[in-house]
């Protein structure tokens, strides 16, 4: 099977409707693999899938539905049809992306001045960061970066509050290319 588009996301109503009543196979990926448009994937049922997204396609995200297959007609090699766990005939299969948690530092600076200092200092290292507001799952305004022991040392040295966590990030961290 070759996947050429993202059909929806199970974290949204339309994506949940796509997979409702279907057997869900998962493709488990680390965050770094989400940015690759062309790759070979393997489901948790050991099925191989080719991914060939067009240029300009968005990065993969946790919960993306990349394939939906209808159930084989009764008597077509599946006995009395696929089951969805309720005892009712199933609607077929769906393949969904599941992202592994990323080791991150969640930085909760105490003021906008402290956050600007941290962001500027880490920006000079060309480190990718994601920012979240108080309405996010973090419940506070925070900056999140991939774990790096030198960043942890920097934060400790300057007394900046942070916590090290494993998180499924909403968007992948990208490598920051830079030349002088």
Swiss-Prot record:
It holds the Pfam family UreE_N. Residues 71-90 are annotated as: Disordered. GO terms for cellular component: cytoplasm. GO terms for biological process: protein folding; protein-containing complex assembly; urea metabolic process. InterPro entries: UreE, UreE_C_dom, UreE_N, UreE_N_sf. Its main location: cytoplasm. Belongs to the UreE family. This is Urease accessory protein UreE. The gene is ureE.
